[in-house]
C-alpha cells in the first residue's frame, strides 16, 4: 500500500534541483505544464542523477502511479531503453527504474514495468555494453523483490523463454541469476511453478557455453531446495545428478528411491523433479528397474491431492506404462504396472493414455479484466490501463491456484487498489471481496465471507505452515482469533488439531504473537507421574508461571470444587476428572488471553462438564481454542468452528450444528454414524470349556472389598457382579467413585482385600486403560508392527507379567513354601512348576513337576488341592498361559498383523513404516485397541474409550461392539456412547455398586447357544506360509456300524454279496 505523504517524509513543497519547477507547475499550470517540465529534465533523469530520481520518487508517492504518465516519465524510460546509439541512456533508464523500485514506490511502477518494459529489460542483459548488462540485471532483481508473488507466473514465462532461446549467452546467465532471485523473493509460488521450470532447466544445463552450464546447475540446486517433500529430500542431490548424467545415474537413483516409503502429500514441485527420472526409467532395459518405477509411480500418485496436480505429467508417464504393460514377460511385474496405470487414471480422472488430455480450464485473463473493471466501478473507482491489467493478472493467478483465502486476496490486491487516486481502504476491501466471490463462483467453488470478519479485537492474525515429522499438516494456512470467542477445532484424526495447539504453545507458529503480547496457556489433559506425591495446593504454588498468592490459589481451587481436605490430598490419589480440574485451575490463575483446551471434558462427569461449560460461556475477556469429541459440549460453548481440511484452516461462525449445516460432509463430527468405508472389526473369541451359552458367567465377584494402602477408607465395598459373553455393561458414576478401581480388579491389575472372586481358567481379557497411551509410552520409537512383535514375542502377552497378581505377598510366600512340599509314597518331593492341565469333572487337574526329578515322576493334582497349598499364583499363571495359547492360533507375522490393524482403520503404511511417536492421538488409540484384542479376548474392558477417538471412530467402535461375539464393559461419561452400546448399567457411588438391566446366570440351561464354527480349509503357519488342512475321516459310530451290517446281511440274502464284502466283514 502506498504510504501517505506524511509517512513518506515528503514536505508540502518539494525542493528540487533537477525537477524543481515540476511540483509547482503541477499545482499552478495543470498537467500540460507538468509534462513539459519533466520532459525538459530527461537528460538528468537518464544520467543517473540521484537527486532527480529522489524528487521523482517523492512526487510519485504524492500523486500515485498516474504521475509517471502525467509527467511523461514512462515515455522517457521507453525512449531511453530503445536508444540503440546511446548506452548512457539505456543504462540510465534501467538505473531510474531500479531506484524507483528501491526507494519505496515499487508498487507504483510495478504495473508499468510488467506491462511495458519487462521484455526490453530481459533483452538488455545481452547489451554489448557491460554497464547496461549489469544495470538491467540489477533492475530486474529490484523489480522481482518488490513485485507481487502472484505475478511470478507471467514473469517466469518471459524469463524461461529467453533462457531457452536467447542467442546471447549473457541473456541466458542473466535469466538464470534472475531465477535464483525469484527463489528468494517468492519461494512458494516458485515451488508451485516447478513443472514449468524443470523442463527448461534440463535443457539449459546442457548449453554449449560453459558459463551457462555452470550457472544453471548451481541454480537448479537452489530451485530444488524449494521442494518440501520430506520423503525425497535426502535424494535431491541424486535426482539432480540423474538429470545431468542420465545414463549413469538413473538406474542408481531408481534403486535408491525404490526402498523409500512415501507418506507425505505429493505436490506438483515433487512430481516436476521426479517425472523426468521416472519417464526415463520406463525406457531402461531391465524388467526389475521398470517394475520399481511402476511401484514408485503407484505409491506417489496415491498421495496426490487432486487431478490438477497430476494432469500435466500424465502424458509423460501413462504412454510409457501402457507400452511396457504389453511387453513385460513377468506376470507379477505386469500386474504392478497395471496397478500403477489404474491409479494414475483414477487420480487424473482420465480414461486413455493421457497424451490427448486437455488441460484443466484456467481462468481467462480477458474475462477477469472485465470482472476487475466491474468491481472497481461498483466502488466508483477507475484504474489506469496498466494497473487494471496488472490487477487482472493477479486475480486470475489466485483463482487458477484455487486459493480463495480472504486474507490472501486482501493482502495481494489492496496495496494496488489503494494506488488509485481517491480510493479508500474500505473500498479496496470491498473490491477484493467482490472479486474473490465472483472468481470462486466462476471456477465452481463456493466461498462464504462472513459479515463479522472485522468485528472485535484481533489477538492473532497470521499465515503459516505446519508439519509433523514427514507429514505436512497445514500449508500457508491463516489463523485469525478474536478476543472473547470460543473456537472449536474440528478435523479428522491426523489432521493436526493437537499438533497445532502444541505448536502454538511451543512458539512454533510463524507470526503468532509472542508471550509478551498475548498470554497463552495449554490445558494438559494429564499430569506427569513425577508430581504424584505433591498435594494439589503444593502443585499449584510450585508453578513458577503463576504469579499469585496462596490465598488466591486456595480461593480458585475452592471455585473449581476442591475443599480443604482435597486440596491437601496427593495428586496421585486423584481420578482423571479431578486431575483435569487441577489443570483448569492453573489456567484460571494464569489469567491467559488464549486458552488451549485439548479434550477438556475427558474424565469429567456430568456435573463437572456442566461446570466447565458455564465457565467458558461466561468467559468474556479470554479466547479459547477447543479440541473435543463431545458434540454437545461444542454446541453449548463454541461461538465459531475452525475446520482443518485440505491443509487449510477455515472459520465458520456459530456452533457445531451451524457448521454442519454449512458443511454437510462434516456431519460425522455431530452424529455417531460412519460410512461403509470406515469401520472397526473386533476379532471373535474362541470357545471356552464348559461354556455352552453366551449368558453363562465367566467372571464373578461376591461381596468384594478393596482398599489402596495408606487411604482412610475402602475404595470398593460389598461389590457383587458377573460378566459373560453377552454382557454389554456401562460402568457409570461421578469422578472418584471407584469405577477404574473396579476395572483394575477385573483385569487382574490388583487383587481384592476380601470377598470372593472367580474367573474362568481360560478367560482372556482385553483391556484399554483410562490413560490409553500408557500401554505404548515406553515404545514410541517402535512402529506398531515392532511393538506387536515385542509384546507377543513369547506367545504370551508381556504386559500380563507386569500385573499385581503375578507378585506374591509375604503371607502368600510363607504359605507357598509349606505347600511346595509333597509327600508321595513316603518320599518328600519339592514342587517345581506346572507343566500341563486336563479336565477333571467340573474343574481341572494339573501336571506338576518336581525339582531334581524326571518327567516320569510328574503327578496329576486337582486344582483345589494346589490352591489349598498356597500355589494359587502358579495355577493362575498357567491358566493365563493356556488361555493365551488357545487364543494365539494366529501367526505373529507382518501380513497378519497388518490385516489386524486394518480392521481398526490403521493403514499398512502407518503399521509397518511409521513410528508411534509420529502418529496422531487417534491413531495411537487405534494401535492400543488393536494390541489389546490381538489374543481374541472373550471380554473387552474399555476405560473411557471416548477420550481420544474422533466422532467417526466412535461410531465405528459402537458398530464393532454390536457385532462382537464376546462381552464388553465400558467406563464412560458419554451418555450418547453408553446408550448406543450398553443394555446393563453398573452405577458406582462412593465405592458401592448398584447393577440394573442384568440377566445373570451360572448355568448353561438358558440363553443363546454357542455353535462351533466350521474351520477354514487353509491355515497360516508362524512363518506366514499358507497350508491346506487335511480333512480327518469321520469316526464311525456304533449306529453306523449296525446299519452297515444290516445292509450286508440284506445283500447276502439277495445274492449280491461279493468278495469285497467278505473283506469288509473281516
Swiss-Prot record:
PROSITE patterns xrefs: ABC_TRANSPORTER_1, ABC_TRANSPORTER_2, HEAT_REPEAT
InterPro entries given in the database record: AAA+_ATPase (IPR003593), ABC_transporter-like_ATP-bd (IPR003439), ABC_transporter-like_CS (IPR017871), ABCF_EF3_subfamily (IPR050611), ARM-like (IPR011989), ARM-type_fold (IPR016024), Chromo/chromo_shadow_dom (IPR000953), eEF3_ABC2_chromodomain-like (IPR015688)
Gene Ontology, cellular component aspect: cytosol
Superkingdom of origin: Eukaryota
BP-aspect Gene Ontology terms: cytoplasmic translational elongation
Pathway this chain belongs to: Protein biosynthesis; polypeptide chain elongation
Compositionally biased spans, kind Basic residues: 1042-1054
EC number of the protein: 3.6.4.-
Residues given in the record as ADP binding sites: 418, 735, 944, 947, 973
SUPFAM superfamilies (UniProt xref): ARM repeat, P-loop containing nucleoside triphosphate hydrolases
Keyword Zinc-finger applies: no
Name of the featured protein: Elongation factor 3
Amino acid at each position: 500500500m502506498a504510504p501517505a505523504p506524511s509517512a513518506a517524509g515528503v514536505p508540502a513543497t518539494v525542493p528540487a534541483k533537477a525537477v524543481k519547477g515540476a511540483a509547482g507547475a503541477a499545482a499552478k499550470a495543470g498537467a500540460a505544464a507538468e509534462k513539459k517540465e519533466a520532459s525538459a529534465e530527461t537528460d538528468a533523469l537518464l544520467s543517473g542523477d540521484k537527486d532527480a530520481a529522489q524528487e521523482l520518487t517523492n512526487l510519485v508517492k504524492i500523486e500515485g502511479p498516474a504521475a509517471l504518465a502525467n509527467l511523461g516519465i514512462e515515455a522517457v524510460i521507453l525512449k531511453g531503453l530503445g536508444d540503440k546509439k546511446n548506452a548512457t541512456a539505456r543504462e540510465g533508464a534501467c538505473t531510474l527504474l531500479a531506484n524507483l523500485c528501491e526507494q519505496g514506490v515499487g508498487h507504483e511502477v510495478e504495473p508499468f514495468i510488467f506491462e511495458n518494459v519487462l521484455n526490453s529489460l530481459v533483452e538488455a542483459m545481452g547489451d554489448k555494453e557491460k554497464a547496461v548488462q549489469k544495470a538491467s540485471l540489477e533492475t530486474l532483481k529490484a523489480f522481482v523483490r518488490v513485485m507481487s508473488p502472484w505475478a511470478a507466473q507471467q514473469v517466469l514465462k518471459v524469463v524461461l523463454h529467453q533462457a531457452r532461446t536467447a542467442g546471447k549467452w549473457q541473456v541466458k546467465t542473466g535469466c538464470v541469476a534472475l531465477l535464483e532471485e525469484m527463489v528468494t523473493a517468492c519461494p512458494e509460488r516458485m515451488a508451485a511453478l516447478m513443472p514449468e521450470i524443470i523442463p527448461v532447466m534440463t535443457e539449459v544445463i546442457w548449453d554449449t557455453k560453459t558459463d551457462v552450464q555452470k550457472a544453471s546447475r548451481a541454480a537448479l540446486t537452489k530451485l530444488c531446495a524449494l521442494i518440501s517433500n520430506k520423503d525425497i529430500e535426502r535424494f535431491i542431490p541424486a535426482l539432480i545428478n540423474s538429470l545431468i548424467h542420465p545414463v549413469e545415474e538413473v538406474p542408481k537413483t531408481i534403486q535408491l528411491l525404490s526402498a523409500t516409503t512415501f507418506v507425505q502429500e505429493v505436490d506438483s514441485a515433487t512430481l516436476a523433479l521426479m517425472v523426468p527420472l521416472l519417464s526415463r526409467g520406463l525406457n531402461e532395459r531391465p524388467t526389475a528397474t521398470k517394475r520399481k518405477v511402476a511401484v514408485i509411480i503407484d505409491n506417489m500418485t496415491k498421495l496426490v491431492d487432486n487431478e490438477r496436480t497430476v494432469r500435466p505429467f500424465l502424458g509423460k508417464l501413462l504412454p510409457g506404462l501402457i507400452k511396457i504393460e504389453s511387453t513385460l514377460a513377468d506376470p507379477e511385474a505386469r500386474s504392478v504396472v497395471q496397478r500403477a496405470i489404474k491409479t494414475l487414471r483414477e487420480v487424473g480422472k482420465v480414461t486413455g493414455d493421457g497424451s490427448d488430455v486437455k488441460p484443466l480450464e484456467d481462468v481467462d485473463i480477458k474475462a477477469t479484466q472485465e470482472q476487475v473493471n466491474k468491481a472497481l466501478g461498483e466502488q466508483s473507482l477507475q484504474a489506469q490501463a496498466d494497473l487494471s491489467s496488472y490487477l487482472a493478472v493477479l486475480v486470475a493467478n489466485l483463482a487458477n491456484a484455487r486459493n480463495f483465502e480472504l486474507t490472501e486476496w486482501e493482502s495481494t490486491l489492496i496495496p494496488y487498489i489503494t494506488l488509485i487516486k481517491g480510493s479508500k481502504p474500505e473500498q479496496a476491501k470491498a473490491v477484493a471481496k467482490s472479486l474473490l466471490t465472483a472468481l470462486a463462483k466462476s471456477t465452481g467453488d463456493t466461498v462464504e465471507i462472513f459479515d463479522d470478519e472485522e468485528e472485535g479485537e484481533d489477538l492473532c492474525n497470521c499465515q503459516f505452515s505446519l508439519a509433523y515429522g514427514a507429514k505436512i499438516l497445514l500449508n500457508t494456512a491463516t489463523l485469525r482469533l478474536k478476543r472473547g470467542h470460543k473456537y472449536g477445532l474440528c478435523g479428522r484424526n491426523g489432521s493436526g488439531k493437537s499438533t497445532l495447539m502444541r505448536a502454538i504453545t511451543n512458539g512454533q507458529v510463524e507470526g503468532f504473537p509472542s508471550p509478551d503480547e498475548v498470554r497463552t496457556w495449554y490445558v494438559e489433559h494429564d499430569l506427569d507421574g513425577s508430581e504424584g506425591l505433591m498435594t494439589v495446593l503444593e502443585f499449584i504454588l510450585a508453578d513458577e508461571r503463576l504469579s499469585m498468592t496462596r490465598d488466591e490459589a486456595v480461593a480458585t481451587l475452592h471455585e473449581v470444587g476442591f475443599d480443604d481436605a482435597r486440596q491437601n490430598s496427593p495428586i496421585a490419589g486423584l481420578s482423571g476428572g479431578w486431575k483435569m480440574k487441577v489443570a483448569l485451575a492453573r489456567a484460571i490463575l494464569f489469567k491467559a488471553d488464549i486458552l488451549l483446551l485439548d479434550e477438556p471434558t475427558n474424565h469429567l462427569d456430568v456435573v463437572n462438564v456442566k461446570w466447565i461449560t458455564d465457565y467458558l460461556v461466561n468467559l468474556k475477556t479470554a479466547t479459547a481454542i477447543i479440541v473435543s469429541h463431545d458434540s454437545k459440549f461444542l454446541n453449548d460453548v463454541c461461538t465459531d468452528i475452525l475446520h482443518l481440511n485440505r491443509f487449510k484452516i477455515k472459520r465458520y461462525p456459530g456452533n457445531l450444528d451451524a457448521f454442519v449445516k454449512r458443511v454437510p460432509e462434516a456431519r460425522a463430527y455431530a452424529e455417531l454414524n460412519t460410512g461403509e468405508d470406515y469401520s472397526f472389526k473386533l476379532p471373535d473369541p474362541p470357545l471356552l470349556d464348559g461354556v455352552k451359552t453366551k449368558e453363562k458367567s465367566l467372571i464373578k465377584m461376591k461381596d468384594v472389598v478393596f482398599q489402596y494402602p495408606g487411604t482412610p477408607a475402602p475404595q470398593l465395598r460389598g461389590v457383587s457382579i458377573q460378566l459373560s459373553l453377552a454382557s454389554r455393561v456401562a460402568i457409570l458414576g461421578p469422578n472418584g467413585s471407584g469405577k477404574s478401581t473396579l476395572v483394575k480388579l477385573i483385569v487382574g491389575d490388583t487383587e481384592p482385600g476380601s470377598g470372593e472372586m472367580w474367573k474362568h481358567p481360560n478367560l482372556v481379557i482385553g483391556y484399554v486403560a483410562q490413560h490409553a497411551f500408557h500401554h505404548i509410552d515406553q515404545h514410541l520409537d517402535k512402529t506398531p508392527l515392532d511393538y506387536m512383535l515385542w509384546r507377543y514375542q513369547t506367545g504370551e502377552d508381556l504386559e500380563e507379567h507386569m500385573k499385581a497378581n503375578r507378585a506374591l505377598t509375604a503371607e502368600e510366600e510363607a504359605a507357598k513354601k509349606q505347600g511346595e512340599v509333597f509327600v508321595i509314597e513316603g518320599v518328600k518331593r519339592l514342587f517345581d512348576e506346572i507343566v500341563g492341565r486336563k479336565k477333571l469333572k467340573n474343574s481341572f487337574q494339573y501336571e506338576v513337576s518336581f525339582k531334581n526329578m524326571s518327567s516320569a515322576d510328574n503327578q496329576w493334582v486337582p486344582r483345589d488341592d494346589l490352591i489349598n497349598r498356597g500355589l494359587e499364583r502358579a495355577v493362575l499363571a498357567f491358566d493365563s498361559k493356556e488361555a493365551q495359547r488357545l487364543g494365539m492360533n494366529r501367526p505373529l507375522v507382518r501380513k497378519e498383523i497388518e490385516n489386524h490393524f486394518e480392521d481398526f482403520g490403521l493403514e499398512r503404511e502407518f503399521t509397518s513404516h511409521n513410528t508411534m511417536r509420529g502418529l496422531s492421538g487417534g491413531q495411537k488409540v487405534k494401535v492400543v485397541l488393536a494390541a489389546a484384542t490381538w489374543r481374541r479376548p472373550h471380554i473387552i474392558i474399555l476405560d473411557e474409550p471416548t477420550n481420544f477417538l474422533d466422532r467417526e471412530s466412535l461410531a465405528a467402535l459402537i458398530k464393532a461392539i454390536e457385532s462382537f461375539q464376546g462381552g464388553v464393559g465400558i467406563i464412560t461419561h458419554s451418555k450418547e456412547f453408553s446408550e448406543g452400546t450398553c443394555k446393563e448399567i453398573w452405577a458406582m457411588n462412593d465405592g458401592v455398586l448398584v447393577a440394573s438391566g442384568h440377566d445373570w446366570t451360572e448355568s448353561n440351561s438358558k440363553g443363546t447357544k454357542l455353535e462351533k464354527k466350521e474351520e477354514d480349509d487353509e491355515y497360516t503357519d508362524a512363518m506366514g506360509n499358507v497350508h491346506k488342512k487335511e480333512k480327518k475321516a469321520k469316526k464311525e459310530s456304533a449306529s453306523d456300524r449296525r446299519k452297515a451290517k444290516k445292509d450286508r446281511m440284506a445283500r447276502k440274502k439277495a445274492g449280491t454279496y461279493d468278495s469285497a464284502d467278505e473283506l469288509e466283514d473281516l
